[in-house]
Amino acid sequence: MNILYGIQGTGNGHITRSRLLIPSLRKKGFNVDVLLSGRKKDEYWDMECFRPYDTKFGITFQVANGTVNKWKTIKKLKLKQFWTDLKSIDSKSYDIIITDYEPISAWAAKKNGILSIGIGHLYSFLYNVPMQNGFFLDKKIMNWFAPVDIPIGLHWHHFGQNILPPVIPQLKGKVTNEDFVVVYLPWENPNLVESVLNKISDKVFYVYGHTSEKIVRDNIIWKPSSRAGFIKDLESCNGVLCNAGFELTSECLSLNKKIMVKPVMSQVEQLANVKALDNLGLATTTNKITTAIVSDWLENNTRNSLPYFNVVDPLIDWIECCLLYTSDAADE
């Protein structure tokens, strides 16, 4: 049985989730081709578990200083390239297409009548979950971006809908609370981040991203992207300051870590995540990063957690049943 698995590459959360699902599908004996889009090939890291995989340009949002730039996003669209990439996929060689909000694979399935399954947090927004008011056009675009036949939404709460818990790794290292804070703000201006954190001189911050090598400046240690290094620090840190992405927030909550999230402004998913976190009382949220706001959060020792659920195994079993049913129906 052949599967095309599309991964939206703009956010590391999509990749983290797929690192769990794709090897599990292959262990079941399925042939899985992997397609990533949304960033340049040399900007991916720790990708061994996906090999072999292909990369395409895809569609992505342009972000500057923590805010989505809609006009720049429109200018950067390469619709001709998207159409070329779409036509290059031999969809008929696949029994099913699975996508984690990756548009090329989703539209290839739709164009060629292949059964498609969407697995990801963004598919939970097709249900009645907390969302910011307004953003009517943005919400329509979200629904159009990577359409599927069967959407499987993931969220921190079911909200009375058919929604699954987060697909996250069960981290097995020793969880401690050492005297440093992990910072992951890839969409923010690094100079602003540094100026804010430098003023909190009695705290040590491990800031991931924005550098290709380790740099120590006063109380800030800049670290290059590394999944293994990041997880090690995540397990032992005293708190996490990050954007309002779904996957990292889920990992923090599973480890009972103190967390402050700042959404990428005008990004509907992250604004919705902030609303959900506020409604559920799971994290401290802020619309801007300032020394006073971060200092107040550091003084607050409130921690919230969510239980870990093994979502991967039953989800893989369900996908296997879908494939067997599809195969039996085709043979009749």
Regions found by a protein language model. Give the residues of each.
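Conserved small/polar residues in nucleotide/adenosyl-binding loops
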Residues: Y325-D331
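Donor-nucleotide binding loops and adjacent catalytic segments primarily
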Residues: I22, V167-G239, T291
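Conserved nucleotide-sugar donor-binding subdomain of glycosyltransferases
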Residues: T67-I96, Y101-I104
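A donor-sugar binding/catalytic signature common to diverse glycosyltransferases
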Residues: I97-P103, A108, G118, D233-A272
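A nucleotide-sugar donor-handling region in carbohydrate enzymes
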Residues: L126-N189, V207-H210
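Short amphipathic alpha-helix
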Residues: H14-L25
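Conserved nucleotide-sugar phosphate-binding/catalytic loop shared by glycosyltransferases and other
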Residues: Q8-N12, V32-L79
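Conserved nucleotide-sugar donor-interacting segment of glycosyltransferase catalytic cores
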Residues: Y94-K139
